[in-house]
């Protein structure tokens, strides 16, 4: 029977003890009562005053409506939404009606007042309605298309997908209303619209469920949406006039509100038009929450907080415009007094957020915990037992800062972060596999990245050297970036995602559904790469190991070139995001103009993107999460903190080491991962350290360190600093089942999400029962073998302590030590097997696999 199978029965009790000890469609216009939702309303006596928004209402036409926002100021200063809880009274009883949720609907022409009252407090709202009985013109793009968007008709899963649905296709999310109008009104000989009998139009019959519809019933016949579409069809289904106003932006009220848990808040959304008019579109906009564990939102614009504290952003989208409402939800419990020293600028803004949310930070991490955390986060390497012992016993109050400075100057830091950047810069040999010429370029680019990190090359220069690279890999290794990317679209996608923290690939084909970026924005960026030229140059072999001449790719800037905007087929003008069109002379490289815009200190994306990326590396979650999806509708959990980190980077002349020091020298980074009663549910405020699984390369190297059994990687270039280390590998072409099963990325995208961090069964089985791990445990000259060598006369207690220091950077607890010694006592004649078993148990604990 193989050793690894014999090992199992004897290990169950010991491993069990050790593992256990390790750290570880439109809705009806009715609002439910507060009591039915578990909401505790304020006592009338606690309400100090009432405020209303808007302060007056003007309605035009029978289709118009307005949402009232009633806010109470309570005795303790808190604000409470009462929009659906006050009593509404219309003074003349006829001009308008007010729903229980506070929606004002015109009934007849005239002027009156609405009185909103709660207990003995009341407020009056003037209201005027006109042209209620007139059939005002309807604009297809402004009024009909938003209905299709709200009901999901033009979503990617329905008629908005590229192939359409059941023979009917309209533009995704209504971004091309002219095309939609033709498809709806004129295609198929106009069979979808029946102007002479609107209610018999196929459009309305399917939407109302009169005729079978794969998407089910979308409208009720008495709904506002049905009535408006019916009136539009009856009016001849017009598109509208060229002089009709168009939407320029949307706004929301309120923009932010501090809410208690299990509460609700109504907001209102407004469209601003080119003619200066403003329209309430609360019931026509589309909503989504970025964190439904904290807050949800319904179709009427009512936000409901749940049982968790934190912050949630509610996206409101209307005709390609987006805006967000932010809900801050404190824990709402009485907390003990606490003080938090500001070791770096980080602590100022994290501690303020904890106060806002009613959180209490965890204690400072123990020295042993910190040293392991720091070594893994900065170097991808475990500290040795001596390094742990020396650090823990050191009485210098500045020892943590000094260790940080020391590790930042280590070769392992450069290798580890070179590996991180190589992932998203797609440093690989690609389809050519072990082709020598491609391998040389890959190694050269990897070495260039490593040297740049080791020498703390200013980040703006780092990016400029990559994006503006010319020549060949022998003289300018960053030109290798242009080997894997061939089309302007690829350059735009990777540039935006890696260096600006933006995912704008959607705008290649259509307006971005969750951002303001249009196809014009996308192709304006692509135009900067239109003049890239490539040519192949054959050179003689440079060393005896090469067989024949080598072909090099030379990158240069052409005097002319363009890309066509997919939207209109015309040549796109060079234009940076949110910037005006640029003219670039024929003797200039457009890429340099793009980089000039990117690295400008006023650029709203560049510094924040890398600051957020580095923060995510150390904390496991970005201030903006996902870390490369920075957009209005995915706001930072702590915008002031992100601004401060970006400013720090700029002020340091784009020193990445300075950025790292600002983060890891903070007390926030050095907090314990052990939660308290106040932060145990925190997932976004960093009131405690969030444990992280070790990445594939780091885990393999750690396993090799603990077992003292290095992994051999065939063909690895010689290196004087860290030979035979996974974090040293220049690309993904080195065969390793271990690295693949633990989530090593193949570098086929610029997204860090390609690296898999989730656990799976294959990983567990590989650690438990693979030949690879077994061979490392049993290797002659390995850790277990050395511990039983006659030259090592130390008692078993010291040897067990050493193993724990290697694996966990701590000594064993009394229970750990007792279990280990009892296990060794059962193997007097085969003590090496006993130590192999203990190592095996250590490697299979969460404490080993996680950085905490």
List the model feature ranges, each with a label:
Residues 113, 117, 235-238, 306-326, ...:
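Structured, non-catalytic alpha/beta "coupling" segments that mediate domain-domain communication
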Residues 838:
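Globin-like tetrapyrrole-binding proteins
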Residues 338-412, 423-718, 749, 753-755, ...:
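Primarily short, surface-exposed interaction patches in extracytoplasmic proteins
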Residues 1-7:
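N-terminal secretory signal peptides that target proteins for export/translocation
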Residues 25-150, 159-160, 164-166, 170-171, ...:
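Extracytoplasmic soluble-region selector
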Residues 126-181, 192-193, 197-200, 209-230, ...:
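Sequence context surrounding c-type heme c attachment/ligation sites in exported
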Residues 707-717, 725-728, 738-743, 749-766:
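Long, His/Glu/Asp-enriched segments that create or flank divalent metal/ion-associated functional microenvironments
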Residues 9-21:
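Bacterial N-terminal signal peptides
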